[in-house]
Curated annotation (Swiss-Prot):
Gene for this chain: tmk
Catalytic activity: dTMP + ATP = dTDP + ADP
Record-linked Gene3D superfamilies: P-loop containing nucleotide triphosphate hydrolases
UniProt protein name: Thymidylate kinase
EC numbers for this chain: 2.7.4.9
Gene Ontology cellular-component annotations: cytosol
GO annotation (BP), single: dTDP biosynthetic process
Pfam families tied to this protein: Thymidylate_kin
Keyword terms of this UniProt record: ATP-binding, Kinase, Nucleotide biosynthesis, Nucleotide-binding, Transferase
Function: Phosphorylation of dTMP to form dTDP in both de novo and salvage pathways of dTTP synthesis.
């Protein structure tokens, strides 16, 4: 029996990191994770050793090092292939739980809807890269592009975060389309941290309490 795979998606600034931290603190005492199983939190890009190096290439804010849209897509895909092979699949096959900050649908949103790369090309690449792995539960933390920019105003942005609001609007629209198609759990990220966390916990319990 495989472990459970939870993914949290959303545009930058939506609070994914905070909510993954909240969820990872609660899950071990929730009664959902069987004795002997572990909880692993990870992220994309950068979840593996190779991924950390690729993350530096992907997010480098030096415009002289900016990759083409296709090269960017393939770098993300290389990161994910390694992430699945080295981290996600071994954990799930060991009956461990995995929570990931982003997975393959971020590529559809950012490189597909954001960069206008053909969605079928991305889906074909991802079908190879993901090696059959897909989330058991995906959350979409929804905020407006304007709120995203406001929340990050005092941060030093990486290359993707430096893109203008038009790009962010396209990405956000993509996430909304994907969320509807795949029946994700959509949560307003404009609420306070505790309210969002409680909604995530309730959904996790409802989805997994009968299966553990």
């Amino acid at each position: 029996m495989k472990g459970k795979f939870i993914v949290i998606e959303g545009i930058d600034g939506c609070g994914k990191t905070t909510q993954i931290d909240e969820l990872s603190k609660w899950l071990p005492s929730s009664g959902l994770i069987k004795k002997g199983s572990k909880l692993i939190t990870t992220r994309e890009p950068g979840g593996s050793h190779l991924g950390k190096r690729l993350r530096g290439l992907i997010l480098d804010n030096n415009q002289n090092n900016k990759p083409s849209p296709l090269a960017e897509l393939l770098l993300y895909s290389a990161d994910r292939a390694e992430h699945v092979y080295k981290i996600i699949s071994p954990a799930l096959n060991n009956n461990d739980w995995v929570i990931s900050d982003r997975f393959s649908d971020s590529t559809l949103a950012y490189q597909g809807y954001g960069r206008n790369i053909n969605l079928e090309i991305i889906k074909n690449i991802e079908s190879i890269v993901c090696q059959g792995e897909s989330p058991d539960l995906t959350f979409f933390l929804e905020i407006s592009p304007e709120e995203s920019i406001f929340r990050r105003k005092n941060q030093i942005p990486d290359r993707i975060e430096s893109e203008g609001i038009e790009f962010l609007e396209k990405v956000n629209k993509g996430f909304k389309i994907i969320a509807k198609e795949k029946n994700w759990t959509v949560i307003s990220a404009s609420q306070n941290i505790k309210t969002i966390s409680n909604q995530i916990k309730e959904t996790v319990l409802n989805n997994f309490s009968k299966n553990t």
